[in-house]
Every structure is written in structure tokens, then in C-alpha cells.
UniProtKB/Swiss-Prot annotation:
UniProt entry tagged with the keyword Mitochondrion: no
Name listed for the protein in its UniProt record: Hydroxyacylglutathione hydrolase-like protein
Organism lineage: Eukaryota, Metazoa, Chordata, Craniata, Vertebrata
Signal peptide: none
UniProt keywords, alphabetically: Hydrolase, Metal-binding, Zinc
Pfam families found in the cross-reference section: Lactamase_B (PF00753)
InterPro entries found in the cross-reference section: Clx_II_MBL (IPR035680), Metallo-B-lactamas (IPR001279), RibonucZ/Hydroxyglut_hydro (IPR036866)
Cofactor mode of binding and number, as noted: Binds 2 Zn(2+) ions per subunit.
Cofactor: Zn(2+)
Residue sites binding Zn(2+) 2 per the record: 58-59, 134, 172
SUPFAM superfamilies named among the record's database cross-references: Metallo-hydrolase/oxidoreductase
């Protein structure tokens, strides 16, 4: 299974997933169809379907033009608001494209009908892949525009049950801003510090791919699965937030004027400790994860 990462618009990612034996391909979140078709032609593959994570313009705007250019193309997703949708998918439904299996995972929070896609290939040594749209990004998650914070938390918890070797392909390039925010929230967290150094050392076009178990403790099978789950948000209040580490409390208070406001529902132990579990009271902005 080959994944082509296609940066588009200001900070979006489209993807082309190729089954290398049959040369069958599936696109994820088509925003710029002509750019996608250039790569389809260059790779010499047959595009058979589009997987759309959610209905927002920057993830689905290319569907109508692509459907016009490729009659009979399947446009799949969970939300009936998705442009040119040909079939609505259900949570837990499985699809197959050649040797590639797709498991559909409903992950509401950012939108009510947000779907993430877990892909793997038969008899292939390559790790499975998760196309998470705006549910999960590098060191963050999407804003809760339609769903609740609890829904987002549950969605992330479900993604945390995926195999630890899973590669995560997200919908936006927000790596540096997420990690810089995370460092202000968790100044004692060595994982955040290491991941930020990792991100700064990498070319921008590669930061959209997050590999679980890469050595920094981040990844679907790393931070999430080991209990280092931090779900935060840029909201309008710091009420209800408690940190047990005095240093973290002092640093957080000192950076209050420059750090986006956060509303936390519960408390957690020191961010530098082995486990951190914070849940949300509300979420109206990017979240910190891991």
C-alpha cells in the first residue's frame, strides 16, 4: 500500500492510496481535483473511489468537479452534506479496494458526521494507516464545531485502540502551532519537547504524517494507548483547571496573556508524570493530544 501525500490550499492534505499490485487507487479528502488527477496520471493508476472525512469545504469541495471528470466515481462518507455523495457509510462498515481493506470509524466532535478511515492490506509488511481528517492531527485535534467535548474525547479514545504501529495521516498541517501550545500547557513534558524538536527538523511537507512508535511516545499506539492522553482546547475560560505540579501552575499563569484560553473539566497529575488524563469541559479550538 502506497500513500501519496498531497499538500493543497493553505495547510490541507489530500491523499492518494494506491494498491500497488492492481494499480487501483482511492483518494481521501479531495479539495483540488486537478492536482489529484495530475498525480493519478503520473502514477498510472485507476481511481475508483473518494473517501471524504467530513463535509467542510476544504475537504470536500473538489468532489463535484471530480465526479464530473470521472463519471461513475464512488464518493463515500458518513454525512449527507458531503458534496456529490454517492453512498453514505456507517460506523464499523468495511470496504475493500483490491487487497486494501477499509474500516470506517465514526469520530464525531469536529462535525457530527465525521468519519475516519483505517486501512490495511492483506499479506503486506507495511503498517496500517489511519486517515483522520480533522479528528486527530499531529499533537492535536480539530475544534468541536458541531459535537461535544465528550464526543471528541470518546472519538480519540477509540482511535487510541488501533494498533501501535499505525501511521496517522491527518487533514491539516498544524504541527508546530499544536506543539508550541502543548509546550505552554505542559512545560514539564519531555515528550512534547522532543516532538517539537522532531517537527522543526523535518521538511514541512512531511509533518502531516505521524508515525506511531517513532521514539517520542506520540502516535496512536504510543501516547494515546499508554494513558498519556491530554485533550485540551482553546476556549474562553480557565475555570476548573487544576495542575498538581507547582512549576506547571506558575508557568501557566505567567503565560496566561499569550496562551489561548482553555476550559478544562477535570484535573490531572503533573504533565511530566507518567500518566496524564485531562478531559474537557468545552472545546472551541485546537486540542492538545499526547
Amino acid at each position: 500500500m502506497k500513500v501519496k501525500v498531497i499538500p493543497v490550499l493553505e495547510d490541507n492534505y489530500m491523499y492518494l492510496v494506491i494498491e500497488e499490485l492492481t494499480r487501483e487507487a482511492v483518494a481521501v479528502d479531495v479539495a483540488v481535483p486537478k492536482r489529484l488527477l495530475e498525480i493519478v496520471g503520473r502514477e498510472g493508476v485507476s481511481l475508483t473511489a473518494v473517501l471524504t472525512t467530513h463535509h467542510h469545504w476544504d475537504h470536500a469541495r473538489g468532489n463535484p468537479e471530480l465526479a464530473r471528470l470521472r463519471p461513475g466515481l464512488a464518493v463515500l462518507g458518513a454525512d449527507e452534506r458531503i458534496f456529490s455523495l454517492t453512498r453514505r457509510l456507517a460506523h464499523g462498515e468495511e470496504l475493500r479496494f483490491g487487497a486494501i481493506h477499509v474500516r470506517c470509524l465514526l469520530t464525531p466532535g469536529h462535525t457530527a458526521g465525521h468519519m475516519s478511515y483505517f486501512l490495511w492490506e492483506d499479506d503486506c509488511p507495511d503498517p496500517p494507516a489511519l486517515f483522520s481528517g480533522d479528528a486527530l492531527s499531529v499533537a492535536g485535534c480539530g475544534s468541536c464545531l458541531e459535537g461535544s467535548a465528550q464526543q471528541m474525547y470518546q472519538s480519540l479514545a477509540e482511535l487510541g485502540t488501533l494498533p501501535p504501529e499505525t501511521k496517522v495521516f491527518c487533514g491539516h498541517e498544524h504541527t508546530l502551532s499544536n506543539l508550541e501550545f502543548a509546550q505552554k500547557v505542559e512545560p514539564c513534558n519531555d515528550h512534547v519537547r522532543a516532538k517539537l524538536s522532531w517537527a522543526k527538523a523535518r521538511p514541512l511537507s512531511r509533518r502531516g504524517k505521524r508515525v506511531g512508535g517513532e521514539g517520542t511516545g506520540f502516535g496512536v499506539g504510543g501516547a494515546l494507548r499508554q494513558g498519556l492522553m491530554v485533550t485540551g482546547a482553546c476556549g474562553h475560560s480557565r475555570r476548573g483547571m487544576r495542575m498538581t505540579c507547582p512549576l506547571c501552575r506558575r508557568l501557566w499563569a505567567r503565560s496566561a496573556s499569550t496562551t489561548p484560553s482553555c476550559g478544562w473539566r477535570e484535573y490531572g497529575c503533573c504533565p511530566g508524570a507518567s500518566t496524564v488524563t485531562w478531559t474537557l469541559r468545552k472545546a472551541s479550538g485546537d486540542c492538545v493530544l499526547g
